[in-house]
Amino acid sequence: MDKNLMMPKRSRIDVKGNFANGPLQARPLVALLDGRDCSIEMPILKDVATVAFCDAQSTSEIHEKVLNEAVGALMWHTIILTKEDLEKFKALRIIVRIGSGTDNIDVKAAGELGIAVCNVPGYGVEEVADTTMCLILNLYRRTYWLANMVREGKKFTGPEQVREAAHGCARIRGDTLGLVGLGRIGSAVALRAKAFGFNVIFYDPYLPDGIDKSLGLTRVYTLQDLLFQSDCVSLHCTLNEHNHHLINEFTIKQMRPGAFLVNTARGGLVDDETLALALKQGRIRAAALDVHENEPYNVFQGALKDAPNLICTPHAAFFSDASATELREMAATEIRRAIVGNIPDVLRNCVNKEYFMRTPPAAAAGGVAAAVYPEGALHHRAHSTTPHDGPHSTTNLGSTVGGGPTTVAQAAAAAVAAAAAAALLPSPVPSHLSPQVGGLPLGIVSSQSPLSAPDPNNHLSSSIKTEVKAESTEAP
């Protein structure tokens, strides 16, 4: 067996410097798809790539130059990349999601097209955990509503008025906090909650035995048990097809009457209509949501618009000045690793690495071994005749047709050559792809940081598949 066939398939994005007596060589193009500020990314990438911003909400707003030439893309959570969107990019080799969630990217399609998808799962853990505790404390002590009463001019002249206004305030010590998911953020919340006197339990079917003992927590093995035992439920898991509307009519009935609910994970985990009804009926005493199924959240629209005892914040749990800088630096560094190294070897957080791994060889006709790629990764475009067949079509790394494997470096070189030919034709440069000082074709012109960034939700190692969900397929 040829041992080379068991090795990862490697792609390399070509990086060329200046020749002493020659023209400036074009660098790989990296695009920020749905933002404008590249001031943090530029110092990390400027010596190996040209950086452009698109400030787009969909691929229809992305300039043709980026679609044809970009080998790397940075993106927040405000743009969605479906398979059809991904096929518009002719030279793309890597996407880095500035955040932890990748639910706005068709990861499977990206892998089949030879595009590595990476995220930044480790940033903002402290910020989200702190925000979670802030929301929990507000629900228990009703600080948010009491502050609003004072702001509206209400006067408290005696204990009876205080008692009336603060009705529903609860003591924390001795209550049970139930965490759905005990990853980075869930663990951070657990440690903070214990300091306040909570009895902390958790449900996470994907963690090894003993994690509860190492943290001094109590583990339950079904979601029903967690909901039944918890005075406050806090969600800390990713969103996928298995746990969409995890909090629904059926699961709310499993909760203790008058329990609290907190969600700083993903909006789609909660069915808004069912939650609104539960708040009106008092089955859930109060709820706090930093994330919403439809964002940006509009307090005057949707099922929750007239729900009582509800705190909503604008998907900002992840944010602090320090975490925002850290997040963007980590994302840009991942792009840099892809440019100067081999994909997927150098990538720290590639979520579809399996599409770049070779499987054991299968016996071909005449006894010749043939390399097989999972899902046809990198193979599809090598034999495609669709209009989208650009430089991607040269990245069948295991093909022996045409003299052997072709690297991403050659693909990038082909894109550069095509761009050079296109440069001979007059074409206007859009305002958001402005010239950069120093001879680089594109760059940044704004230092305004995007205010709407993704949350760094901690995640379970896989999807939460619960008995409750299987039993509640009829729930809204």
Swiss-Prot record:
It comes from the Eukaryota. Coiled coil: none annotated. The keyword Cytoplasm does not apply. One of its GO terms (biological process) is chaeta development. Its main location: nucleus. The active site is at residues 266, 295, 315. The keyword Ligase does not apply. GO terms for molecular function: DNA-binding transcription factor binding; identical protein binding; NAD binding; oxidoreductase activity, acting on the CH-OH group of donors, NAD or NADP as acceptor; protein homodimerization activity; transcription coactivator activity; transcription coregulator binding; transcription corepressor activity. Disulfide bonds: none annotated. Keywords: Nucleus, Oxidoreductase, Repressor, Transcription, Transcription regulation. CDD domains: CtBP_dh (cd05299). Residues 445-476 are annotated as: Disordered. GO terms for cellular component: ISWI-type complex; nucleus. It holds the Pfam family 2-Hacid_dh_C. Homodimer. Interacts with hairy (hry), knirps (kni), snail (sna), and Enhancer of split m-delta (HLHm-delta). Complex may be involved in transcriptional repression. Also interacts with adenovirus E1A protein. Belongs to the D-isomer specific 2-hydroxyacid dehydrogenase family. Corepressor targeting diverse transcription regulators. Hairy-interacting protein required for embryonic segmentation and hairy-mediated transcriptional repression. This is C-terminal-binding protein.
